[in-house]
Curated annotation (Swiss-Prot):
Organism: Exiguobacterium sp. (strain ATCC BAA-1283 / AT1b)
Keyword Nucleotide-binding: no
Pfam family, one: Ribosomal_L13
Oligomeric form and interacting partners: Part of the 50S ribosomal subunit.
Signal peptide: none
Protein task: This protein is one of the early assembly proteins of the 50S ribosomal subunit, although it is not seen to bind rRNA by itself. It is important during the early stages of 50S assembly.
Protein name in UniProt: Large ribosomal subunit protein uL13
Protein family: Belongs to the universal ribosomal protein uL13 family.
UniProt keyword annotations, A-Z: Ribonucleoprotein, Ribosomal protein
GO molecular function list: mRNA binding; structural constituent of ribosome
One GO location term (cellular component): cytosolic large ribosomal subunit
Length: 145
């Protein structure tokens, strides 16, 4: 009888992938990045083991949103104090902290537990074209579709 393969955390091989977000649609990019962070593209994927790769995203400031989402989409955060609910539109967030928009979208697509937090730590988002991970020799990854 054959047994199902279960990867061990010590045996997982991780790559560094570089993705250029220039001109890409937010949702299409983030769903594929979430899949890469989880390791679902690998034949050795195991749900309870972090088998994902490190993902570097550059040019986050040049991401595209379809329709009128730039003005209509609202991001909320709360300070924890009474009356501490803050809100800003996608346009304002893109102007101030463009990498935050990608991080929030990807974080929502990962598991909500310690494994998801571990996978999220392998995401590195930069607003411009420069990044500080040249020593890791990242491979350029082309998105499907």
């Amino acid at each position: 009888m054959r047994t199902t393969f279960m990867a061990k955390a010590s045996e997982v091989e991780r790559k560094w992938l570089l993705i250029d977000a220039e001109g890409k649609t937010l949702g299409r990019l983030t769903s594929e990045v979430a899949s890469l962070l989880r390791g679902k593209h690998k034949p050795t994927f195991t749900p309870h083991v972090d088998c994902g790769d490190h993902v570097i995203i550059i040019n986050a400031e040049k991401i595209k949103l379809t329709g009128n989402k730039l003005n209509d989409k609202i991001y909320y955060r709360h300070s924890g104090h009474p009356g501490g609910l803050k809100s800003q539109t996608a346009k304002e967030l893109l102007a101030k902290r463009p990498e935050r928009m990608l991080e929030l979208a990807i974080k929502g697509m990962l598991p909500k537990g310690s494994l998801g937090r571990q996978q999220f730590n392998k995401l590195h988002v930069y607003a411009g074209a420069e990044h500080k991970h040249e020593a890791q020799k990242p491979e350029v990854y082309e998105l499907r579709g």
